[in-house]
Amino acid sequence: MNKKILETLEFDKVKALFEPHLLTEQGLEQLRQLAPTAKADKIKQAFAEMKEMQALFVEQPHFTILSTKEIAGVCKRLEMGADLNIEEFLLLKRVLLTSRELQSFYANLENVSLEELAFWFEKLHDFPQLQGNLQAFNDAGFIENFASEELARIRRKIHDSESQVRDVLQDLLKQKAQMLTEGIVASRNGRQVLPVKNTYRNKIAGVVHDISASGNTVYIEPREVVKLSEEIASLRADERYEMLRILQEISERVRPHAAEIANDAWIIGHLDLIRAKVRFIQERQAVVPQLSENQEIQLLHVCHPLVKNAVANDVYFGQDLTAIVITGPNTGGKTIMLKTLGLTQVMAQSGLPILADKGSRVGIFEEIFADIGDEQSIEQSLSTFSSHMTNIVDILGKVNQHSLLLLDELGAGTDPQEGAALAMAILEDLRLRQIKTMATTHYPELKAYGIETAFVQNASMEFDTATLRPTYRFMQGVPGRSNAFEIAKRLGLSEVIVGDASQQIDQDNDVNRIIEQLEEQTLESRKRLDNIREVEQENLKMNRALKKLYNELNREKETELNKAREQAAEIVDMALSESDQILKNLHSKSQLKPHEIIEAKAKLKKLAPEKVDLSKNKVLQKAKKKRAPKVGDDIVVLSYGQRGTLTSQLKDGRWEAQVGLIKMTLEEKEFDLVQAQQEKAVKKKQVNVVKRTSGRGPQARLDLRGKRYEEAMNELDTFIDQALLNNMAQVDIIHGIGTGVIREGVTKYLQRNKHVKSFGYAPQNAGGSGATIVTFKG
């Protein structure tokens, strides 16, 4: 679409209205590049994206996106083979973090049906290893020690050397206090120095780095720390070299993924722009219009977005209607009406919401042309008429059936009769070519043209004769009329003069009376329509409230069911625990044999209600999923206190993690999720604890050393029964070697027990013949 119409309609100012709702530089750049299109599929896609985002906001009203900076230049530098600096890596790190947050948000999103937005969410990439690499850079722009082993080693040596320097200087401060002007360590040229009185400068050996302005103080680096300082300087150089090497290495690791990261950044910006459109809809009560396939326009309560307190109007541009001619005085908002129509079309064809009511419909035009305002050129010495006519001639040569044309004060600037004739001729040419046109004029001759000509409709702007002010209400189907006599009379002009004037144009009085009747009918119809709209709005509010209440009730119902299931499962667990305690008490007070106790326990289990299956419970699934680590999670390695990122899970259940440039293999207990740590720090959840009375937990080992034979055999009998009751597969019995009496007693007991599958001495490194390992039957 031609740029001139965008400038005429001030489209850039309209786009600026969306900027406060954007969170990313990528979204801002896409907004600035936004332009109208005539491709129906592109417009439909933009409309569908906004509607899906609206549905998303219903479920997630606080949906947001992390702010990101533009990285196109950074990715281009990578592709050209350049190495990045820390600031550039932090920009990439932010994009990867935002991408991961959006993926996580989408994975946990429920109760929303997405199609267009799903395409973008699923296009985002996952880079767990790169995220781990980039953990080497903290947000303050510092390379962490764990970025490489060499960097950690160098920094440890620097720290140790600096500590030595401090210790030496502190000792000298005490020893040479009388020789110093101040009891502090100063810094000159990056070196630690002592402020020595000039009279004692030869008493302290070292290097002079500075002298005070008065000459009374000499800043000396003592000889004892010179060597250490030189070592520190050398280590600092090594540190800089190692940091450069790390930057080069991580640049090489990121380089193959530069295009994918740039694509992710674009998607983040696109989602941000869609989000900003919906925030604009919420703020300004805008709507996503319907799209007409045949250039039919129906705008309900449409407003100009740049006019404060704009009056809302209806515009109907049916399929067969070719021209709307707005007649009447120059005041009243005719030009604003032209711009409102054009700007609304431009916004819709750019994929933006419009300021109108639901049910509004827009067409698709390949071009929109306009001749609005006085665009005469002083340099060309063109009159107002010549300027307008030059522009119109140019437009008439370019328009076709797929164009929308806006003409302001058509035929103005010349003789009224000739101007009116030219205006009618131009409108007739456009009508015959079936080009949709909205034109304004103050020539009364065009009223008759609008009434008598097919597919052309008159319109006007309402004027309140009581207040002598325009109301800016658009009256489609009603031609404009002059209010000169009413205004003159109200302003105090003699009724005789007004009457004489009206007699001179009796011929036009009939027309004015008809127009007046049409105005009254239009106003009455508008009042009825406004009442209908108020009822519709109330119904919509009621429907929204009922839907919200229904959803809340469903959520509460699901929550209560989940609580009930959990309580039922807890009751079952408590019942089984109590049954265990009962059986233990029975065993201690009776001569029941182990196998009889086991059979009794099995019967009790059959009597207990079936365990509640919570495997399909969404709430518990979501909580479990949230707690379980997954590829891409940020972690803290507990033994080192360093951050990293999980990159993969091994078959044995262990995890591989990237910690700076170091790859580590960790068990789940050796790390903590960063998110879990943050949750602990931010909020302490109140936990309801159910206290249960129970004995000690099952023991898998019995130590009989130092026991008498009878005491040992009684303990062995109780231990084996307890092990069987707790379904243990294997236990250890430590009897020692000694005289062998207890060992022999253990062997005989195990041989007699029918629940024992096998037993034998432990390996040499686990006690040898001083311990017996027992395996029970399944």
Swiss-Prot record:
SMART domains per record: MUTSac, MUTSd, SMR
KW Cell cycle (keyword) present: no
Superkingdom of source: Bacteria
Positions bound to ATP: 328-335
Nucleotide-binding recorded as keyword: yes
Residue stretches making up the Smr domain: 702-777
EC number: 3.1.-.-, 3.6.4.-
EC class: hydrolase
InterPro entries: DNA_mismatch_repair_MutS_C, DNA_mismatch_repair_MutS_core, DNA_mismatch_repair_MutS_sf, MSSS, MutS, MutS2, P-loop_NTPase, Smr_dom
The entry's keywords: ATP-binding, DNA-binding, Endonuclease, Hydrolase, Nuclease, Nucleotide-binding, RNA-binding, rRNA-binding
Disulfide bridge map: none
GO biological process: mismatch repair; negative regulation of DNA recombination; rescue of stalled ribosome
Any one GO molecular function term: ATP binding
Family: Belongs to the DNA mismatch repair MutS family. MutS2 subfamily.
Protein function: Endonuclease that is involved in the suppression of homologous recombination and thus may have a key role in the control of bacterial genetic diversity. Acts as a ribosome collision sensor, splitting the ribosome into its 2 subunits. Detects stalled/collided 70S ribosomes which it binds and splits by an ATP-hydrolysis driven conformational change. Acts upstream of the ribosome quality control system (RQC), a ribosome-associated complex that mediates the extraction of incompletely synthesized nascent chains from stalled ribosomes and their subsequent degradation. Probably generates substrates for RQC.
PANTHER family per the UniProt record, alphabetical: OS10G0509000 PROTEIN-RELATED, SMR DOMAIN-CONTAINING PROTEIN
Subunit structure, as described in the record: Homodimer. Binds to stalled ribosomes, contacting rRNA.
Protein name: Endonuclease MutS2
Organism: Streptococcus pneumoniae (strain Hungary19A-6)
Gene that produces this protein: mutS2
